[in-house]
Amino acid sequence: MNTKAVIAKGFQLPGHFFFSNYFYGLCAVALSIEASLQQQFPLNGFLYYFLVFITTVLYYAYPYIKKTTKPTTNPRTLWYNEHYQLMRWNQIIITIILTVALILFLKDHGSDVLQMSFRQWMVLAVFPIVAALYYGSSSGMGKYNLRRIGWLKPFVIGFTWAGLVTVYPVLFQSVINEQEYAPGWVGIFLFIKNFMFITLLCIMFDVKDFATDHLYRMRTFVVRLGLRKTVVYLLLPLGLIGLSCFIYYATTHRFSWVKISLNTIPFILLILVAISLLRRRRPLLYYLIVVDGLMLVKAVCGTIAMLYF
């Protein structure tokens, strides 16, 4: 392989990593660890976090299982079409790995799962149900799935992610310790915080799909309000409200200034990234790396703040 080919292949690596949704899996694990520490619960074992990772990767790859024949300029769709066979085998292998991991998980914790209370089952079930309704089905529900309700889409994604990374780690601890799941005010605050943060990221991500959503009459906030109004009247005010609420919470609970500073970094970056969307059109990788990357930044900052300050 010549030098130019090696360099070209190197430039493709970020696309492979982000288009394959492994980055989402990494973010889900990192946010789960952060939420456990912030709620002062023990970290779960490797198998738990592996299931979080592999399930997230598989879920986000679901829309691309079928090779599309429609004309498209979407880089991610084009990438999946180009690497269709590779990703098909990737899906099969991941599904097999997930099945084996679930068997091992149930082998260790099957008795605990069987003893779950009705309340625990309800909490466990609500987030996968909402996640399934987001995609719908190709038979009857696909025509009316939640994904087609443009303004609702960010809230559905934010709710599902908040449940996965905030509720599930604590729920799992309550199950294996044979305790009733009873989230405190800290847990509720963190759920709302993660819900709002990820919802704002989803609204920013809709900027990328403005032309397509407008064509297919997907009434997202960006389509309804326009880019400038979405940023100025929605993203910036909500980002500032989230930042203000955290600072108020942190000061009333006597957080150290270092801890407060670390946890404000993700909100400040979110506001700056939202403003950057006004300047010029951004490529898809910008949204995958920079916008979605704020989830990882939030997790890292929150984890460092809890461990060392």
What are these regions (language model features)?
Residues V29, I33, V52-T69, F127-Y135, ...:
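Central hydrophobic cores of alpha-helical transmembrane segments in multi-pass inner-membrane proteins
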Residues N2, V6-Q39, L43-V52, R224, ...:
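Catalytic cores of Mg2+-dependent Asp-rich isoprenoid enzymes
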Residues A30-L51, I103-W121, T166-I192, I247-V258, ...:
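Helix-coil boundary and interhelical linker segments in multi-pass alpha-helical membrane proteins
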Residues S36, Q40, P63, K67, ...:
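Membrane-water interface at transmembrane helix exits
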Residues Q91-S139, L235-R282:
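Transmembrane helix-loop-helix
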Residues L43-Y62, A125-I129, A182-M204:
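Membrane-embedded alpha-helical segments that form the functional core of polytopic membrane enzymes
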